[in-house]
């Protein structure tokens, strides 16, 4: 039996201290060193772990109710770990982190805080699975090039001299941990990839994609499979067995930049004065088949990722911009939802059919808005001549649907989205609030109708499916919203019971046009549960719908592609029993994967946007702007400028005498009596902008201090 095995066996029988082990297996300096080497190996391999200076096997640690967790946040002197079931997190003091990094799977002992009654802390007993790839910045510190991880900018790690990979001070890099120490600062890393300067948002965005395993390049097998779709057209043979809708004046409406066009629309009046609305969706499932490399990659990606002027598509361009995209004047295969509505806009019937269509024109939101408003010039009018006679009926139908939305109490949040203006080198030179007109709202409502029909179809047919689920907000979030509303002088009962969507909608309407509009809108949005995908229908709280799914974007969302495939199979005559066997597990897996990847995509898009905003702010250092206090914390104020750029004013820069926080809505200087209230306007100066971290610092403008 080797020394390593002997030590493991001894600890398994009886937890031991280092002194015990040296006394039993050591004796001199050389033997003691071998004991420590064997013990270190056992700890590193997560066979043995330590608690309070006593070593015991991981198996016995589990027996003592140790918890399996994942490190989710790391600070200079602390960490947070998430339980395996993701129900709650645990605070880990710095002395108990054992050098663990974000993403590591760890074994944790939970215990009561020694000084705060009722508060729990934890200690990491062992690192079970190491996540050794990190993204951050190369920084020259104390004469040496070191690595500062994005996940914990307060920590720096040694870059091994022969593994610097040509990195320079300030470069955005990905590294691999080559040697782990007992503390995070003791880890040794080597550069795996250089992205370029961390002062450029486009480089930081590339690093964000890399960190979350989102690849801009498709695998060779996928690209090879996609080649057969290059230049492909729809033949008459392809059209057989489909409803021929080529005679309908179908058209698309998107932004001017859109190249992956999922959806098209048509509208006719019925003899009774009602409407027949057609929502025609790209039939991606006709090309992306189960078992193909394309399908496996689409499942893994689950969504396209959009940021600035870039897109990382779910499908290769030969499909996303080619044969699947409903391009103008090109024959395309579609999956159509044909809906009948009465003269008041109520849905009375629908059917789903496989179809062949030809879009008459690539519509642009701004141009359609001009037509609807009667301000379009002759050139725009000529462009839409084939489809323009549908627009008055579409406007009328949308007015009916908007009224019905209001009656059922749908919550309509202001999006707060911004448009990033880039120069020819990809640098952000301007930021503007994104505006939305009547055509955007109209298309959104028509797509929502088709999504509702798809979910209703599946629920009635009782087939496996991927539903879009939005549950009611939980108690803790509602308590925070209640406090915010009370601080704004708005009475509510939300601390005691869950509000209806109609009640929330009424509050939003009540603050419209006031100083609290943006703050209440943001606070209410944050209190909402996250929408996700599930295999069971649970309804949609925000839309106030019993049935909801995502049917209308199969080029960029896998759930849509998944339900197209399921619905196609049922419409072709497959019986319910076969459907259950074929798709039950698939619906569960697609729901889980799509929910997880959507969260990651949204995080990347938001972080990338922050980097671009900071890049814009760097161009305006020292300049003064008026903003609104959008957040109040003990540390200071968050200020949002008119264009949607947000920065932070530290409390220490407001007054030298210290501040007091009142319920998250006010900072006060008890000496001067000055208050800074949520919703107040404030003149600020941009003083710092960290593109790498996407953070902007403001100070109160000199004239505002007087």
Regions found by a protein language model. Name each.
Residues 1-278, 285-330, 366-370, 615, ...:
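Charge-lined substrate channels and their catalytic hotspots, especially those that engage the 3′ end
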